[in-house]
Each structure stands twice: as C-alpha cells, then as structure tokens.
Amino acid sequence: MTAKPGFNDYIVKDISLAEFGRKEISLAETEMPGLMATREEYGPKQPLKGARIAGSLHMTIQTAVLIETLAALGADIRWVSCNIYSTQDHAAAAIAAAGIPVFAVKGETLADYWDYTAKLFDWHGGGHPNMILDDGGDATMYVHLGLRAENGDTAFLDKPASEEEEVFFALLKKQLKEKPKGYFAAIAASIKGVSEETTTGVHRLYDMQKAGTLLWPAINVNDSVTKSKFDNLYGCRESLVDGIRRGTDVMMSGKVAMVAGFGDVGKGSAASLRQAGCRVLVSEIDPICALQAAMEGYEVVTMEDAAPRADIFVTATGNKDIITIEHMRAMKDRAIVCNIGHFDNEIQVASLKNLKWTNIKPQVDEITFPDGKRMILLSEGRLVNLGNAMGHPSFVMSASFTNQTLAQIELYANNKDGKYKKEVYVLPKSLDEKVARLHLAKIGVKLTELRPDQAAYIGVKQEGPFKSDHYRY
C-alpha cells in the first residue's frame, strides 16, 4: 500500500508500513463501537462538511479510527502527534496512504515537532483550519502566542523557561519574519472552536478564560465522565505496567512502586502496579485524594520518604518538578523512573543533561550519577505508556474519541445564535450517557430500564439523564 498518486502532503517514517497499519486499524474498529456507531448515525447527515480540522493528538491506531470517523462525517483534516514519542509509524503511514495529510514520526526532534505543528495551519489549496482538536493544548497555544507576538508583545520570546520553549519560540520568531503580516490574525479569525482531550490542555484553557485571552469557544472533553473516569482510570490501569515491562523486562511482583498523584490517572496507575504485584506508595497534596488512597490500602507518603525505598517511580500529577534531582540522588541504584502525565517536566530531566547517559534501547536510558549510582529513565520523562508501549486499549479510547467527535459537531454545526461564547464548556450529561450507552452491547451489558412510576419517584426522565450535573461518579 502506498500513498495516492500525486499526494505528497505528509511526513511519515515509512509509507510502506501503511498495509500493516490498515490491518491494525481494522482490528481496532471492532473494539471501538462508539466511533463506529457515530459514523452510522451521523455519516448521512455530514455535520462536519466544510470543517477543516487541525488535529494535534497522539498518532496511534486508535487515533486513526477517530480521524477516519471525522472524515466520514464530512471533515477535511490535517494531523500531527502531540508528543515526540507517541506516534505509531504504521498508523501514520496508513493515514497518509488514505490521502489525509499527517506529519508524525516516532522519535521526532523538538524542532521537527514544532515544524509539524506549524504545518497544521497552512491548508493545502490555501486558507486555514476552522477547527482545532487538541491534546495538551500545543496547537491552541501556537495560535494564541503567535497572535500575541504578531500584535507586538514579543518580549516573552526572549525568555524561554525550558528547552522546548526555546525551540518553540525560535519557530515563532521565524514565522513572524517569513509569514505575511496578519498571518496569525487570519488563523485566529478562521477558527470556530477547539475541543481539548487532556487535563493539562484543559488547565491552559481555563487559565486563558480567566485572563480573558481565550480566542474561541472551547469544549473540555477531559471532564466528560466517559473520558476522565474511563480513559484516565481504566486506560492507565492497563497501559502503565505494559510500558514499564516493555521498557525494562523487570519483574513487577514484590517491587515497591511510588505513584505521585492520586487523581484519575494516579488511581489507574496505582491499580495497575498493585495488580502486577507491587507494594504501592502514593503521594498527594489534596487531603481528599490522600484519604481516598489510604482507604484503598495504599501507604501515603512524601516523595522524600519514598525516594530511598521504592524501586519504581511514576509521576501522574500534571504539575512540575515532582521528582527533583535531590530525589533522584537518594534513589536506589538502577531505580526505574517514568511519567504518565502529559508533559516531561514532572521529572527534572533537564537537571540530568550533564550526567552520563547510556541509551539501552529506544526510549530507555541509563543515567549515571557522579557517585556511580545509576537510574533508568523511560521515554525521557514523557508519556511512558505511549513512548514505551502502545498506549491505552482501543475500547476505552472509543469512549474518549466519541466525545471528541461529538464536541467537534457541537462547536462546528450546533453553535447557532452565539450558543457558545469564548468560554470553556463541557458536553451535556445526555451526551455523556449516550457515549456510555454506545459501548454497553460490546461487553454484554444489559441495562435495567426505569418504569414510569420509578422515574417520577426520583425526578428523572425514563430515558435520562439519570444524575444531576454535580453528581460525582
């Protein structure tokens, strides 16, 4: 399988992997009933006809099913991965072979990453995208910061706070020189809205809303119950240990594992390690989450307590500097350190750059400290489940990506009469329940139906929604 004749608007590792990718996409479709049902229901209506979606989300087999669902609903699409290690090269090749522009290679450099992100916004045939589908907020940030600099506020470009910002800001400077005047303003004016996949990106959106700088309506997909309580929890429960095992071949049973953070991702991560036979420690800043962890039987400690005790360390907080250089110096020889939060700054990887690095295999490095102690770092502190393994299973991603599809429809086709302002929204409870319902038959669930008198007794409709908006699942 090769790309369509004359189509070369893509960058992938090896287009000859497309046939392999297509076979795996076919397998994944069987495990993604929500997306397939969405194609069947909405395909004839073409609600995304005319939509030009700039997608920045891990270019995996499951994402390929999402991309082809959006296309089946009428959208024109350009796609990049939102992490330098998360691309599955056969998935990217299959999408390119289908004639959809994609720019994604597993192990791309930071310079490549930001160059590819910029390519999202130069639409083939001219023009710009009118929708963003984001994971982590980098595509959204590219436009916001590009417009800020274009409008004259450029001081921040000379003050990068990380290696990644240094590369990103250099790209923005280049764009300001090479692109026509008003380039970012034209992109910003074209876009109708953004749907955001993950916790980190949602934090960025709420920060912009609070500051009054959010350029378009946004839908927070992450806080749909059928995303956060399934993808974040059950997805991590399966994929975390998969990544650690593939990276290290270590025996998990009997090891002491430390999980930083006990939100939904941390809960899934702790369960993953416990099921593998680890003795699990947890750290938390939130007394409610700390109490939950203790009631689940985990020992709640600080990172300082855990550093000399644990064999395996996992960060899952969405915050920065969770594992510091001081913590790493206190660890056992060849402790395994990894992250399952979106960005690599949960671990102070930058502080290790001047130490001796020995690459064991792709995304597995041994770092030697001056005293001879060694540490195993997975995926350079980026997402371990996607860098060292294949990410979450297809079934749980079907729920997340069905929410993404419905969010794109809401913002593009259903934003009538100013329904959505320049604010952050969540999908209504009725759609959350719909997404769940679409996945029941696949796993043999028989749903009990309320009788009319029962529905009246608890004050709900027979067909739902069954819970109030403030209900915590």
Swiss-Prot record:
Gene Ontology CC entries for this record: cytosol
GO molecular function annotation: adenosylhomocysteinase activity
Entry-linked Pfam families: AdoHcyase, AdoHcyase_NAD
BP-aspect Gene Ontology terms: L-homocysteine biosynthetic process; one-carbon metabolic process; S-adenosylmethionine cycle
Free-text comment on the cofactor: Binds 1 NAD(+) per subunit.
Pathway membership: Amino-acid biosynthesis; L-homocysteine biosynthesis; L-homocysteine from S-adenosyl-L-homocysteine: step 1/1
Positions contributing to substrate binding: T60, D135, E197, K227, D231
UniProt superkingdom: Bacteria
Major localization listed first in the record, in broad terms: cytoplasm
Binding of NAD(+), residues: 198-200, 232, 261-266, 284, 319, 340-342, 385
Compartmental location: Cytoplasm
Cofactor: NAD(+)
UniProt keyword terms in alphabetical order: Cytoplasm, Hydrolase, NAD, One-carbon metabolism
Reaction catalysis annotation: S-adenosyl-L-homocysteine + H2O = L-homocysteine + adenosine
E.C. designation(s): 3.13.2.1
HAMAP family with a match to the protein in the record: AdoHcyase
Similarity remark: Belongs to the adenosylhomocysteinase family.
Function: May play a key role in the regulation of the intracellular concentration of adenosylhomocysteine.
Name of the molecule in the record: Adenosylhomocysteinase
Provenance organism: Bradyrhizobium sp. (strain BTAi1 / ATCC BAA-1182)
Originating gene: ahcY
